[in-house]
């Protein structure tokens, strides 16, 4: 019997597997940030242990950093302490750190791939739930807790049970203007926020193969939002072209050897998945979440669901609670919903392709007078490239704020946050209650949709944006 891509990677990394015990797998790459690592390093220090493979461990600062200044004190005492601890720990244990003043500093799931730290066939972990992002390269990548962070630092291994496999095939081509964000939100809308629980998802199909690496990262980033452990896309020529020449990618003469191996990393034709879901790409429209989990999502040309449309009493109760929190009335057109803030950024949508898409919409327009709109590049290199292309000038002339790299308004752990009752069109990955600030109301959209909302002051369909403008 053939193997799935997940099974091939997992089997290649098993260190120990015996009956009645959880298998132990080897971890190729460990990414670290300031929030989930301090206690892990303290654990090593207390037990007199070293980092077993410091050359396979890389750290950056992202969650707590200010996007307006490089001052370590800007976001309060807790943020300062966590960043100072990360600097101390990385120096003591010999771990590479991209700190606030390093040109590579940025969101961990943006920094890793762009430096070539993320490679096909690897196992990658980080103390962050959106580590699944790296699965876009055909790597088995997933988030871990702080105690597991300590374990990987000490042993370069992790106990990990075998997971079920789910194949999601997006058949056909998407319409113009439909992005990876729309694809993944449509998938979550179909499966629900728990539809992938217990599975490793492999995304396949013509629409997936057509995505850039940035798009595939957006896709895999949100696999966790349907409950999955990880998301995978098999590596192909798009993957290899992205990786070639990057700092930590194999260099000649090892490059050809690496590519030959990477080409074997695909599910066999006779591989059996535990479940399969198919999506028609042509039916996917620009998506907007209306509720308080990513599964509460509809197309831009639809109305906010009526409560009597939910047959399941649990779903109906959830929808009723979500509508109350979001301050929405059932049956309202999405395009009639006004917004207060716009956030373009996060590990989901802060790469150069995302900024280009938003700038294309913003060019020649002005942000609505009542809207605050911020653009936060995902890393130093993304910021530098955007500025070299003049994207920063387009945003600034349109009335957007151009910021420094960081996680920013994705989560309320720094100075970028919503005030109670404020409504935000956000390119991030979670719209839970209070995610962007206590009482804040989050709607998840693509970068282009976020830019259009900023200009109109309400949600707008980018398919008719030129006409509306």
Swiss-Prot record:
Organism: Proteus mirabilis (strain HI4320)
Class of enzymatic activity (EC top level): lyase
EC number annotated for this UniProt entry: 4.2.1.33
Co-factor requirement: [4Fe-4S] cluster
Cofactor binding note of this UniProt entry: Binds 1 [4Fe-4S] cluster per subunit.
Binding site for [4Fe-4S] cluster: 347, 407, 410
GO biological process terms on file: L-leucine biosynthetic process
Assembly mode: Heterodimer of LeuC and LeuD.
InterPro entries: 3-IsopropMal_deHydase_lsu, Acnase/IPM_dHydase_lsu_aba_1/3, Acoase/IPM_deHydtase_lsu_aba, Aconitase_4Fe-4S_BS, Aconitase_4Fe-4S_dom, IPM_dehydratase_rel_enz, IPMI_cat
Name listed for the protein in its UniProt record: 3-isopropylmalate dehydratase large subunit
Reactions catalysed according to its record: (2R,3S)-3-isopropylmalate = (2S)-2-isopropylmalate
Role played: Catalyzes the isomerization between 2-isopropylmalate and 3-isopropylmalate, via the formation of 2-isopropylmaleate.
